[in-house]
Amino acid sequence: MNDLRYPIGQFTYKRPITEEMIDTWIQEIEDLPNELTKAIKDLDQKQLDTPYRVGGWTVRQVVHHVVDSHMNSYIRFKLALTEKNPTIKPYKEEKWAELPDSKLPVDVSLVMLESLHKRWVNLLYSLELEDLEKTFNHPDTGETKLAAAIGLYAWHGRHHTAHITSLRKRLNW
């Protein structure tokens, strides 16, 4: 049986990272607001409040989480571009998913995601090769180059979109 937590597999990439890989990843980040919107199209409130797996987040929580995560990533990129290997602040995703704003209509987060990704993609397309080598330090996972972080967040968006699309397929929605 497939691992419902990782419907597209865990994040991996081949090295070295090429300009073509970066361009593909940025395009995936740019496409995410539309892809996520399509994934939840025509779902009713009961469906939005259905966990994508036993013990997992609801579809609604997944949508809000993507925005929380990508806001954090955008800030991490800006820190890495303006400071030398800054140590970023992790956050407790599972606790954020329980806060009251995670019960808001998904449209609230979809609007945020659209705006956030316009700014983030603009920033990403402006990066020079030397910028892609800049890093931030995560207290738990260590140093991350911006080039790899672009791939990670492209995967992250596809990963959570697949949580929703695979749930829809399993339940024939």
Swiss-Prot record:
The record's free-text note on cofactor binding: Binds 1 zinc ion per subunit.
GO cellular component entries: cytoplasm
Residues reported to bind Zn(2+): H65, H156, H160
Cofactor: Zn(2+)
UniProt GO MF annotations: hydrolase activity; zinc ion binding
Keyword set includes Hydrolase: yes
Keyword Zinc carried by entry: yes
Entry keyword set: Cytoplasm, Hydrolase, Metal-binding, Zinc
Annotated Pfam families: DinB_2
EC assignment: 3.-.-.-
Broad class of the protein's primary localization: cytoplasm
Summary of the function given for this chain in its UniProt record: Possible metal-dependent hydrolase.
Official protein name in the record: Putative metal-dependent hydrolase BA_2700/GBAA_2700/BAS2515
Organism listed in the record: Bacillus anthracis
Phylogenetic lineage: Bacteria, Bacillati, Bacillota, Bacilli, Bacillales
